[in-house]
């Protein structure tokens, strides 16, 4: 028996309600899908995936299915309820509450979120399931600050796929766009069985990296540009040519262009233009070091086979563990040195006054700060 309380999310195919379950004696989420909005095959696929993920040993960071019902008009999936909603809305609130002079009171444990998200993805892949729609809107947050990966409606029980229009455009891997595969795949009456396959796990790795970028900066790496002939990621060619210069232009330069000049200390200007306050990422240098790790391990363009979530996790663990075991002042200076070395881009697309060579690098050890 369920008592619907209120709608908490409405999408193209389904509406999700918060409800009280007398059977489970807890709040639950009812995902109600009208039968005319989806096929029986699609719903069966989602049900089968959720049944596997919600087996006798469900993963703590995956939103489990508690029950399932159907009648003449609707499919009703009973899911775990997460009190704090999704990360997209949560960060939107944090962004509106915070500013350089009055930072947000909401703090998010970035290290925990990354590890839990990677653990959930790895668990699903170990069961032969790829999510195919990883994004902040599908990451739910509990009252304890833990995450649960949700909405497995696009999931597939296969490491390979030739579906090129699955997922959310801003987070989709480049190989899943029609503009980056053979145009013959999209001709009318084309036999999809002969279309080239992409690796669904490696596509998930890309989406993971794009999602973490959004969590750090509140802005997607790319936006999608569409036309009748081609669909592609806007500015993607710039990223493919030089990802570090692209990230510098997109995320660093805007934070330097708000009234700062050549003489302004880059260290100060970056620190004062932080967008979010992370519990375990106390400064912008940690954030941009994480950017480099993601580019090196997750956001590979030309060869998706080089993407590795295992390498990403190992490098992140190494960076955090190294910092925690070192003297804080020495560690902080190392991070500044690393930032200067990695992000000293010199490209004509970056105005000269925003290039690192025109800023004085802080020397905390020498100055005794």
From Swiss-Prot:
One of its GO terms (cellular component) is mitochondrion. Induction: By treatment with 8-methoxypsoralen and UVA irradiation. It is found in: Mitochondrion. Keywords: ATP-binding, Kinase, Mitochondrion, Nucleotide-binding, Serine/threonine-protein kinase, Transferase. It catalyses: L-seryl-[protein] + ATP = O-phospho-L-seryl-[protein] + ADP + H(+); L-threonyl-[protein] + ATP = O-phospho-L-threonyl-[protein] + ADP + H(+). It is an enzyme of class 2 (transferase). Transmembrane segments: none annotated. It comes from the Eukaryota. ATP binds at residues 8-16, 31. One of its GO terms (molecular function) is protein serine kinase activity. Residues 2-369 form the Protein kinase domain. The active site is at residue 133. The keyword Mitochondrion applies. Its main location: mitochondrion. Its EC number is 2.7.11.1. Present with 339 molecules/cell in log phase SD medium. Belongs to the protein kinase superfamily. Ser/Thr protein kinase family. This is Probable serine/threonine-protein kinase FMP48.
